[in-house]
Curated annotation (Swiss-Prot):
A motif (YXXV motif) lies at residues 701-704. Residues 651-672 are annotated as: MPER. The lineage of its organism: Viruses, Riboviria, Pararnavirae, Artverviricota, Revtraviricetes. The gene is env. Residues 112-156 are annotated as: V1. Residues 299-331 are annotated as: V3. InterPro entries: Gp120_core_sf, GP41-like, HIV1_Gp120. Residues 506-526 are annotated as: Fusion peptide. The record marks 505-506 as: Cleavage. The chain crosses the membrane at residues 674-694. This is Envelope glycoprotein gp160.
C-alpha cells in the first residue's frame, strides 16, 4: 500500500514537472550582441585636395569611444578593416597617377649615349672606407655635395618614329634615367642600343599628370547599425584571442596614406615605447618605433629641372625633360637617435613572447634584402612629392650596426625612376612624368617593416617591402562588428495575450554606442533595460544616418557621386535595411515591435540553459549560435500555425453576432448545407435499403435470380391457407400465403416506387415540421422581443418621468436656497452696516463726550 502511494505521488510530481518545468523559447530584442562583419566602411578626411575629397567625406571630429567589460579576439592580418585600408589607399594612389596613354609605340630600339656635364665636372663616388655623420648645420646639406654623392646617371637617346605624317619617319631625342632603360650588354660602342624598361614584360602607361601622389590623413567610420571595436591592451601584438580591454567606437583614429618600403612614415601609432606586431603564422612583423628618439628622414632632389611635352603622333604627347647638364643625385639623410632606437628594437624583440632566437642583442642585426630582388625590395622605395626614390641603404645599415670596416654615413644616395612597379598589383607599370624644380620632403619615421629570421646563433631582421603591413599597424587593433540585437533564451513563460504595457522612457546615453554599454553586464540585468536599449539602438542609428547625411550634403558639389560617393550614400541606407530586416524577422515569429516576446515553441535542449546572473549575452550567443537556424525555423512554423488557428477562430467569432445570421451570403450557405444534408440522407437511405434487400435475397425471401427473366408462371397453384406446412419447409422457402401471382420483377419495381413515395412523404413531413417549428420559434422570439421592447419603453418612460420630477425638485430646491441665501446675506449686510454706523457714531461722539466731561469737571 505504501509503495502504491509513493508511485502515485511520484506520478503527480512528474506530471506537475511536465506542466510547469517546460522551458519555452523567448525572443529578446535589444540585447548587446554582435558578430564580425565585412561591409564597406566610409572614410572621412580633413584634406581639401580635389581628388582626396572626392574619395572621402569631410571630417567633423565628432567621434566617441566607450569602454566595454567584455573579452574579444583581434587579428591584424585577418581583418576586414586593414584589408579595406590597403584597397582604398591603392585606389587613392591609382587615382593620383591615373594612366591615360599607353606607351607601346615607345618600345622601339633607341641609340643612347651617357650624358656628360657641359659646365661642370662630375664628382666621382668615393670607394674608400669613411665615417661621416652630418647634422642640420652641415654645409653639404645646402650644397648637396656630401661625401660619396655624385650625379644622376642619365642617357640621351635618339629614335625614329612615324609622327603626324604617317608616310614619313621623324627623328626624336629623349633623355632617360639610366635605371629606366635596358641596353644590350654585347654592344661595346660608345653609342648603345637600348629599349625602354619593361617593354617585353608588361604594358606601360603614362600618368595623366593632373596631380601627384601626396600623402593625406583620413579615418574610417562604420555605417549606422555597425560599430568598431578596438583592443586597448598594452601588450597587444597583432594577434590576441582574448583581449580584455575593449572599447567601442564609431570611427578609427586618423591614419596616413603611406606608400613606402622598409620604413613607415608619419604614422599615428607611435608611442613612448617600442612594440612589435607579429603575424600569427609566419615571421612577418611590423615594428613601431619609440617616438622619444625623434627619428626623421629628409630627402631632396637637387637642381632646377624643367619638363617639356613631345608630340610623337596624333593623340600621344610624351612628357620628358631636356638635358642642360647632369643633375645632382637625389639623397636622404636620417636625423635622430637612430642607434639607440635600433638597440631598443633588438631588446624588445628579445623579450617578445613569439621570439625563439638568441637573446644576445649583439647577435641580432639588421640586414638588407637580396640584391637580386625587385628594386622596390632591394632599395628603400619612397615618394617625394611625385618623384619615386630608390635609396641604397648600405651606408645607413653600416652606420646603425657600427660596421667599422665599411663606409658609414647617416645619409644614403637615391636614384629616381619614372617607370615604377605598382606596389599592390603585380605586372603593372606606370611612367610618371618628371616634376619641375627642386624637391624636398621631410617625414617622421614611425615603424619598420621586417621579417624576423631567428636562430640560436644569430637573428636577422630583414627589411621588407610589404606596404600593406603599414596599415596593419595603423588599424590592426580595430575590428568591424555588426550589431545583432535579436537573442534567444529559454524561460518557463509560455506565450499569452495581454494589453501592451507602456514602459518609462530611458535616457539616451552616447547615442548608438550607448546601446553597447550593457555588453559586459549579466543577461538578467541587461534584459531589464531592453525597452530603453531598443529605443537607444534605433535613435542611435537615426543619429548616425543624420550625421552622415549632413557631411554628404556639405560635400555634394565635390562628391559628384563617384564610386566612393556611391558607397557613402549606400552606407546611409544600410542601417534602415538592417532595421527593417530585423523587424521583418521578428514579424515572421509574431514578435514585431516587442522587446520580450514569449512563444509556444519548447526549448530545443533542456541541458543548455543560461546563467542569468553571471553570463553575458555575447557569451550566451556564442553557445547557441549553432541552434539559431533550427530555433528560427521552429518559430516560423509555430507562427504559421498560430495564424491558421486565429483565422479559424475569427470564422467562429462571426457566429456570435446576431446580425450575421440574417446575412444573404450566410443564408445561401445554409441552403447549400441543407441540400447537401438532404442528398446525403437520400443516398444513405438508398444504400441502407440496397444492403437490406441483398441480405433478404441471400436468405431466400425473394425468388431466385437464376430463373429466366422471360419466365411467367402459367398455372397458379392455390394452397390451402389452413393447411400446415412442415416447419423445415416454412423455414427454407418462407410463407407463401397471399395472392403472390405477379412476376417478381414487376412486384419489385412497385415495391421500390412505394418506398420512394414513402421516403418523399417522410422528407416532406420533416421539412414541414422544421418550417412550422422555425415559424413557431420565430413567433416566440418576436413576442419576446415585443415584450422586451415594451418593458424597455415603459422603463424609459418611468425613468424619464422620475428624472423630470427630480429635476423640477432640484430646481425648486435651488430657488429656495437662492432665496434663503439672499435673505441671509441681506440681513447680514444690514447688521454689518448698522454695527459700522454705531462704531462710527461712537468714534464721532468721543470729542463731544470729552468736552462734556471737561465742562462738568470745571463746574
Amino acid at each position: 500500500m505504501c509503495g502504491r502511494n509513493q508511485l502515485f505521488v511520484a506520478s503527480l510530481l512528474a506530471s506537475a514537472c511536465l506542466i510547469y518545468c517546460v522551458q519555452y523559447v523567448t525572443v529578446f530584442y535589444g540585447v548587446p550582441v554582435w558578430r564580425n562583419a565585412s561591409i564597406p566602411l566610409f572614410c572621412a578626411t580633413k584634406n581639401r585636395d580635389t581628388w582626396g575629397t572626392i574619395q572621402c567625406l569631410p571630417d567633423n571630429d565628432d567621434y566617441q569611444e566607450i569602454a566595454l567589460n567584455v573579452t574579444e579576439a583581434f587579428d591584424a592580418w585577418n581583418n576586414t578593416v586593414t584589408e579595406q585600408a590597403v584597397e582604398d589607399v591603392w585606389s587613392l594612389f591609382e587615382t593620383s597617377i591615373k594612366p591615360c596613354v599607353k606607351l607601346t609605340p615607345l618600345c622601339v630600339a633607341m641609340r643612347c649615349n651617357s650624358t656628360t656635364a657641359k659646365n661642370t665636372t662630375s664628382t666621382p663616388t668615393t670607394t674608400t672606407t669613411a665615417n661621416t655623420t652630418i647634422g642640420e648645420n652641415s654645409s653639404c646639406i645646402r650644397t648637396d655635395n656630401c661625401t660619396g654623392l655624385g650625379e644622376e646617371e642619365m642617357v640621351d637617346c635618339q629614335f625614329n618614329m612615324t609622327g603626324l605624317e604617317r608616310d614619313k619617319k621623324k627623328l626624336y631625342n629623349e633623355t632617360w634615367y639610366s635605371k629606366d632603360v635596358v641596353c644590350e650588354s654585347n654592344d661595346t660602342k660608345k653609342e648603345k642600343t637600348c629599349y625602354m624598361n619593361h617593354c617585353n614584360t608588361s604594358v606601360i602607361t603614362e600618368s595623366c599628370d593632373k596631380h601627384y601622389w601626396d600623402t593625406m590623413r583620413f579615418r574610417y567610420c562604420a555605417p549606422p547599425g555597425f560599430a568598431l571595436l578596438r583592443c586597448n591592451d598594452t601588450n597587444y601584438s597583432g594577434f590576441e584571442p582574448n583581449c580584455s580591454k575593449v572599447v567601442a567606437a564609431t570611427c578609427t583614429r586618423m591614419m596616413e596614406t603611406q606608400t613606402s618600403t622598409w620604413f613607415g612614415f608619419n604614422g599615428t601609432r607611435a608611442e613612448n615605447r617600442t612594440y612589435i606586431y607579429w603575424h600569427g603564422r609566419d615571421n612577418r612583423t611590423i615594428i613601431s618605433l619609440n617616438k622619444f628618439y625623434n627619428l626623421t628622414v629628409h630627402c631632396k632632389r637637387p637642381g632646377n629641372k624643367t619638363v617639356v611635352p613631345i608630340t610623337l603622333m596624333s593623340g600621344l604627347v610624351f612628357h620628358s625633360q631636356p638635358i642642360n647638364r647632369r643633375p645632382r643625385q637625389a639623397w636622404c639623410w636620417f636625423k635622430g637617435e637612430w642607434k639607440e632606437a635600433m638597440k631598443e628594437v633588438k631588446l624588445t624583440l628579445a623579450k617578445h613572447p613569439r621570439y625563439k632566437g638568441t637573446n644576445d642583442t649583439e647577435k641580432i642585426r639588421f640586414i638588407a634584402p637580396g640584391e637580386r630582388s625587385d628594386p622596390e625590395v632591394a632599395y628603400m622605395w619612397t615618394n617625394c612629392r611625385g618623384e619615386f626614390l630608390y635609396c641604397n641603404m648600405t651606408w645607413f645599415l653600416n652606420w646603425v650596426e657600427n660596421r667599422t670596416n665599411q663606409t658609414q654615413h647617416n645619409y644614403v644616395p637615391c636614384h629616381i625612376k619614372q617607370i615604377i612597379n605598382t606596389w599592390h598589383k603585380v605586372g603593372k607599370n606606370v611612367y610618371l612624368p618628371p616634376r619641375e624644380g627642386q624637391l624636398t620632403c621631410n617625414s617622421t619615421v614611425t615603424s619598420i617593416i621586417a621579417n624576423i629570421d631567428g636562430g640560436e646563433n644569430q637573428t636577422n631582421i630583414t627589411f621588407s617591402a610589404e606596404v600593406a603591413e603599414l596599415y596593419r599597424l595603423e588599424l590592426g587593433d580595430y575590428k568591424l562588428i555588426e550589431v545583432t540585437p535579436i537573442g534567444f533564451a529559454p524561460t518557463p513563460v509560455k506565450r499569452y495575450s495581454s494589453a501592451p504595457v507602456r514602459n518609462k522612457r530611458g535616457v539616451f546615453v552616447l547615442g548608438f554606442l550607448g546601446f553597447l554599454t550593457t555588453a559586459g553586464a549579466a543577461m538578467g540585468a541587461a534584459s531589464l533595460t531592453l525597452s530603453a536599449q531598443s529605443r537607444t539602438l534605433l535613435a542611435g542609428i537615426v543619429q548616425q544616418q543624420q550625421q552622415l547625411l549632413d557631411v554628404v550634403k556639405r560635400q555634394q558639389e565635390m562628391l559628384r557621386l563617384t564610386v566612393w560617393g556611391t558607397k557613402n550614400l549606400q552606407a546611409r541606407v544600410t542601417a534602415i535595411e538592417k532595421y527593417l530586416k530585423d523587424q521583418a524577422q521578428l514579424n515572421s515569429w509574431g514578435c514585431a515591435f516587442r522587446q520580450v516576446c514569449h512563444t509556444t515553441v519548447p526549448w530545443v535542449n533542456d541541458t543548455l540553459t543560461p546563467d542569468w546572473n553571471n553570463m553575458t549575452w555575447q557569451e550566451w550567443e556564442q553557445r547557441i549560435r549553432n541552434l539559431e537556424a533550427n530555433i528560427s525555423e521552429s518559430l516560423e512554423q509555430a507562427q504559421i500555425q498560430q495564424e491558421k488557428n486565429m483565422y479559424e477562430l475569427q470564422k467562429l467569432n462571426s457566429w456570435d453576432v446576431f446580425g450575421n445570421w440574417f446575412d444573404l451570403t450566410s443564408w445561401i450557405k445554409y441552403i447549400q448545407y441543407g441540400v447537401y444534408i438532404v442528398v446525403g440522407i437520400i443516398v444513405l437511405r438508398i444504400v441502407i435499403y440496397v444492403v437490406q434487400m441483398l441480405s433478404r435475397l441471400r436468405k431466400g425471401y425473394r425468388p431466385v435470380f437464376s430463373s429466366p427473366p422471360a419466365y411467367f408462371q402459367q398455372i397458379h397453384i392455390h394452397k390451402d391457407r389452413e393447411q400446415p406446412a412442415r416447419e423445415e419447409t416454412e423455414e427454407d422457402v418462407g410463407n407463401s400465403v397471399g395472392d403472390n401471382w405477379w412476376p417478381w420483377p414487376i412486384r419489385y419495381i412497385h415495391f421500390l416506387i412505394r418506398q420512394l413515395i414513402r421516403l418523399l412523404n417522410r422528407l416532406y413531413n420533416i421539412c414541414r415540421d422544421l418550417l412550422s417549428r422555425s415559424f413557431q420559434t420565430l413567433q416566440l422570439i418576436s413576442q419576446s422581443l415585443r415584450r422586451a421592447l415594451t418593458a424597455v419603453r415603459d422603463w424609459l418612460r418611468f425613468n424619464t418621468a422620475y428624472l423630470q420630477y427630480g429635476g423640477e425638485w432640484i430646481q425648486e430646491a435651488f430657488r429656495a436656497f437662492a432665496r434663503a441665501t439672499g435673505e441671509t446675506l441681506t440681513n447680514a449686510w444690514r447688521g454689518f452696516w448698522g454695527t459700522l454706523g454705531q462704531i462710527g457714531r461712537g468714534i464721532l461722539a468721543v470729542p463731544r463726550r470729552i468736552r462734556q466731561g471737561a465742562e462738568i469737571a470745571l463746574l
